[in-house]
Every structure is written in structure tokens, then in C-alpha cells.
A protein has these predicted regions:
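Long helical/loop segments within the catalytic core of UDP-sugar-dependent glycosyltransferases
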Residues: 61-82, 86, 112-185
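Short aromatic/hydrophobic "clamp" motif used to bind/position activated sugar donors
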Residues: 95
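Short beta-strand/loop segment that forms part of the nucleotide-sugar
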Residues: 36-45, 67-69
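N-proximal low-complexity "stem/linker" segments adjacent to membrane-targeting elements
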Residues: 1-27
Length: 221
């Protein structure tokens, strides 16, 4: 598939994030990308105004689709299930997993991704940098498993850090074909021991510190 035909389904999940939806979601919806794309938001049974905000935005953006995850089932990993629903609802071959708080800072981010993505990579991790984005391709899903298991692990509270995100593997989005998305989701919300987590952190740090030449840094307008 040529870059002129590549279309993306951007998928995110939200829970009680009405304010972030109002502030950040328009930036995802206002991408200037000629082939076309869609944004899919899966609401994890929010108790705030998230549903109302999504309904209002749908009136203005026909490429926004939202769906609702039923009430909690303690035996089910809700975030993983929410992304599964998003993938099933998607209509395009290329999938991007992200978070509403990871607002794109330019309107040409999708164009930059499409123009520079490695078609031979099974998945690509994306990092927001000061003047654009950095893409980190992986030949197989397994090669990226430590990165994904660490960032998407089960946590009661996630601390946001701003510095050295690439070096520590704190990516902002994942790009992959649809048939790889389910394999990626198998790495979400795992329980990892502190000892194993420390080993993963050190592995990612040294790999990314000395592997910068394997990435592409893109400066957007």
C-alpha cells in the first residue's frame, strides 16, 4: 500500500476525562491528512460528562466514532477490553493506539507518520519531542514487548514524567497494522514483579540510549 492510500484508525479509551476530551480531542480530529482517517473513543463507563462531550463533538466531526463499555466486570481487564472493542469497530488497516492526554502539537502529525513509517516493521512506537515526533520501528511485536509490557502494565496510579521519554521508552502512541493489534493487546495490563520491572527498565534504557540511529526524528510545521 502506498502512503497516498494509507488510512488510519486512531483508538483511545477514556474514563471520567470530560475536561481532557474537550481540550485535547479536537487536536486529533483536526489533522490535515488527505487519504482520510477516523478517531475511535471507547468510554469505560464514565460517571462525568464524557458521554455528553463525545456526543457534541460527533455533531461537528463525522470521522469521530464513540462507543461505550458496559459496567465493570472484575474478572475482565477493562482497558484491554476497551481497546479490543475499538479495534473491532475500526474500518482501516492501520491502527494507532494512544491516549487523549497525548495531544498532537501539529496538524501534520499523521502525514509525517505515513510518510516515514517503515512498512517492514510489525509495529512502531511514537514519541512526542519538542519540535515533532520520533518513530521507533520494531521488526516484530516480540522485540517491542518489554516497552509495551512496562508502559501498559497494571498500575493503581501512573506518574507522568516529561524528561528523557525516549531513553526510558515512555512512548506516546503505537502504530501497527490491524492484524498485529490483537497480539499487542496481549501484552497489556500484565502483573510484573518489581525485580523483573527493574531488569526491563535497564534493558530499555541502554537499548534506547545507544540505539538512536535506528529511529527517525521528524520535525513538523
Amino acid at each position: 500500500m502506498s502512503k497516498n492510500e494509507r488510512r488510519f484508525s486512531i483508538i483511545m479509551t477514556v474514563y471520567d476525562q470530560a475536561g481532557e476530551l474537550e481540550e485535547n480531542l479536537p487536536a486529533f480530529l483536526q489533522q490535515e491528512y488527505e487519504p482520510g482517517y477516523e478517531v475511535i473513543v471507547v468510554d469505560e463507563s464514565s460517571t462525568d460528562r464524557s458521554g455528553d462531550v463525545l456526543k457534541l463533538l460527533r455533531n461537528n466531526y463525522p470521522h469521530l466514532y464513540s462507543t461505550f463499555l458496559p459496567k465493570p466486570n472484575r474478572l475482565v481487564s477493562r482497558r484491554k477490553l476497551a481497546f479490543h472493542l475499538g479495534v473491532k469497530a475500526s474500518k482501516y488497516e492501520w491502527i494507532i493506539f494512544t491516549k487523549v492526554e497525548r495531544k498532537p502539537e501539529a496538524t501534520d502529525i499523521l502525514t509525517a507518520i505515513s510518510d516515514n513509517i517503515d512498512d517492514d516493521a510489525e509495529l512502531t512506537l511514537g514519541y512526542s519531542v519538542k519540535k515533532g515526533i520520533r518513530l521507533q520501528p520494531f521488526s516484530t511485536c516480540g522485540e517491542a514487548s518489554n516497552h509495551i509490557r512496562r508502559i501498559e502494565r497494571k498500575l493503581s496510579k501512573v506518574r507522568e514524567r516529561k524528561r528523557m521519554n525516549y531513553t526510558w521508552g515512555r512512548y506516546d502512541f503505537i502504530v501497527m497494522r490491524k492484524d498485529v493489534a490483537y497480539e499487542v493487546l496481549n501484552l497489556f495490563e500484565q502483573n510484573i514483579s518489581p525485580t523483573k520491572m527493574l531488569a526491563i527498565r535497564h534493558h530499555i534504557f541502554w537499548k534506547n540510549l545507544f540505539g538512536r540511529s535506528a529511529t527517525t526524528k521528524l520535525v513538523t510545521q
